[in-house]
Amino acid sequence: MRYLIISLFLLINSTFAFADGHLTKDQKAQTIECAGIYYANSMIPQAELELDKIVHSFAAKKFLSSYLIKEGVNEDNLNKELIKVVDVRYGKPYEEKTTNECDSFIFELIPNSKNEIEKLIKSGIY
């Protein structure tokens, strides 16, 4: 009986932990990659990319950075990883397909992320 209670407790506890939205290692890595892609996109000159895409990238990068820190990613490590992605992508043209794939991944992974990014865009604080 005791083992049954302990097993039920562990099962319920792990279900709640998963429901809180904690990311797996692979999900964190992909989210950091997408944040880096948005970061690199935000550095593309306005003459080469529409302003709305630059603003979206700024807002998405800000949202994801905050989200990842809340998920327990160390801010210094996050910044180092973002710089690695930017170093690879800086100076390259905007990739619509890659950015859309990141949008789809993030919007599916993080509940209400699309609305939160839209709020940042509308607020002008990004």
What role is predicted for each listed range?
Residues 7, 22-23, 90:
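Generic detector of short alpha-helix boundary/capping microenvironments
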Residues 52-126:
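Compact alpha-helical subdomains of small soluble proteins
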Residues 17-19:
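Boundary at the C-terminal end of the N-terminal hydrophobic targeting segment
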